[in-house]
């Protein structure tokens, strides 16, 4: 059919010849992409479109194809331009976001009257919860202060001190239950006052009727203290005190700090010549008059002044008398046994008995005295 159409002379008269196409290519300049050689025209009847610079596209039947109008071209250009602008705007936004950090958090909304009311109500509820919580905490701490072994009408323990003391108290009670033994008073107070401040330590010691100066807590002790908890009757004074009058061989034979049966008030042993007198008096090497529990009590280390031992104590108006025990009571005929009178008499003092064995009458502080000390005081003065 195609051969039949092209064989008709009426149809081929309007179609330009192929030779004229080849001649026209040499005269016209090449396009910008003219590196590629010109394409030959398609074979007749193939249906492929010709080159773009063809004069008029012709259909197979010889009809002209209508060219696109100007409006259509403008619409296509506008659509393409809008797409390019959108891409450029997106790229610009990405670059701007990369340069400055993004704003985080919720966006601020406009505060309305209803929102203000809700916010105020929430704040009031939160304040009420916090107030009730603090009231409950204070009530619980007050109940805890009534249980711990520290009471004062004028001073109130702080919250942290109350909790620390309660922790130490629980620990001390658990140790008592574990060992099954009654603890020493000094070690018990040291356990209670571990990590506490000095005012709280003084309160605890006062409640337990113990002088706070007689034990060293962690704040003031660097390792060595006057008290070591337990270890015999001489645990209070584990070290000897140097004195020129104690350097004799006669007193050194007595055994240093004395035997285990000696009382805690005796910080060293007697001379060998007088140990037999105490043994004969029934004390077993210890003074018979100092084996009573009434003389129990904490003492500070004695001072060695001019060969004499004297106990350190606070001066008070009621205890200004510093006269010596043996010199004041040696004249009483029935106050001491015969053996004791031999040792503490004035002749014995002149004979060389060391005055460190003769304790001061006012050996206890005023606030450490109880009814038993008042009875002793009345006994000595009658």
Curated annotation (Swiss-Prot):
Keywords: Activator, Developmental protein, Differentiation, DNA-binding, Neurogenesis, Nucleus, Transcription, Transcription regulation. Detected only in neural tissue. Expressed in the developing cerebellum and in primary granules neurons (at protein level). Residues 1-129 are annotated as: Disordered. GO terms for cellular component: nucleus. It is found in: Nucleus. GO terms for biological process: associative learning; axon development; behavioral fear response; cellular response to calcium ion; cellular response to electrical stimulus; cerebellar cortex development; negative regulation of synapse maturation; neuron development. Coiled coil: none annotated. Residues 101-113 have a biased composition (Basic residues). Its main location: nucleus. A motif (Nuclear localization signal) lies at residues 107-113. Transmembrane segments: none annotated. Residues 78-97 have a biased composition (Acidic residues). Residues 121-173 form the bHLH domain. The keyword Plastid does not apply. GO terms for molecular function: DNA binding; DNA-binding transcription activator activity, RNA polymerase II-specific; DNA-binding transcription factor activity; DNA-binding transcription factor activity, RNA polymerase II-specific; E-box binding; protein heterodimerization activity; RNA polymerase II transcription regulatory region sequence-specific DNA binding; sequence-specific double-stranded DNA binding. InterPro entries: bHLH_dom, bHLH_transcription_factors, HLH_DNA-bd_sf, NeuroD_DUF, TF_bHLH_NeuroD. The C-terminal region is necessary for depolarization-induced and calcium-dependent transcription activation. Interacts with TCF3, TCF4 and TCF12. Interacts with CDC20. Efficient DNA-binding and transcription activation require dimerization with another bHLH protein. PANTHER family: BASIC HELIX-LOOP-HELIX PROTEIN NEUROGENIN-RELATED, NEUROGENIC DIFFERENTIATION FACTOR 2. This is Neurogenic differentiation factor 2. It comes from Rattus norvegicus. The gene is Neurod2.
């Amino acid at each position: 059919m195609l051969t039949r159409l092209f064989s008709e002379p009426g149809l081929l008269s309007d179609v330009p010849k192929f030779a004229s196409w080849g001649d026209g290519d040499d005269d016209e300049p090449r396009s910008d992409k003219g590196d590629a050689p010109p394409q030959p025209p398609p074979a007749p009847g193939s249906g492929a479109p010709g080159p773009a610079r063809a004069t008029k596209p012709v259909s197979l039947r010889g009809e002209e194809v209508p060219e696109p109008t100007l409006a259509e071209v403008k619409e296509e250009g506008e659509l393409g331009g809008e797409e390019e602008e959108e891409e450029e705007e997106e790229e610009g936004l990405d670059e701007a976001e990369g340069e400055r950090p993004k704003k985080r958090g919720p966006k601020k909304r406009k505060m309305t009257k209803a929102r203000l009311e809700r916010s105020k109500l929430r704040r009031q509820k939160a304040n009420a919860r916090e107030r009730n919580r603090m009231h409950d905490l204070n009530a619980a701490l007050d109940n805890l202060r009534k249980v711990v072994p520290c009471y004062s009408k004028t001073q109130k323990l702080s919250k942290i001190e109350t909790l620390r003391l309660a922790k130490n108290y629980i620990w001390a009670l658990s140790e008592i239950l574990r060992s099954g033994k009654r603890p020493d008073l000094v070690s018990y107070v040291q356990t209670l006052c571990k990590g506490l401040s000095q005012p709280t330590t003084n309160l605890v010691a006062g409640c337990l009727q113990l002088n706070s100066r007689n034990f060293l807590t962690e704040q003031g002790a660097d390792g060595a203290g006057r008290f070591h908890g337990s270890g015999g009757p001489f645990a209070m004074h584990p070290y000897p005190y140097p004195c020129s009058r104690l350097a004799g061989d006669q007193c050194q034979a007595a055994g240093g700090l004395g035997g285990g049966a000696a009382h805690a008030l005796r910080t060293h042993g007697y001379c060998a010549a007088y140990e037999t007198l105490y043994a004969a008096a029934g004390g077993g090497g210890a003074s018979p008059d100092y084996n009573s529990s009434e003389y129990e009590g904490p003492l500070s280390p004695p001072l060695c002044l001019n060969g004499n031992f004297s106990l350190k104590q606070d001066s008070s108006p009621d205890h200004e008398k510093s006269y010596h025990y043996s010199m004041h009571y040696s004249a009483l005929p029935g106050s001491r046994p015969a053996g004791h009178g031999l040792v503490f008499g004035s002749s014995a003092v002149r004979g060389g008995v060391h005055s460190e064995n003769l304790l001061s009458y006012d050996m206890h502080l005023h606030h450490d005295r109880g009814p038993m000390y008042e009875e002793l005081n009345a006994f000595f003065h009658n």
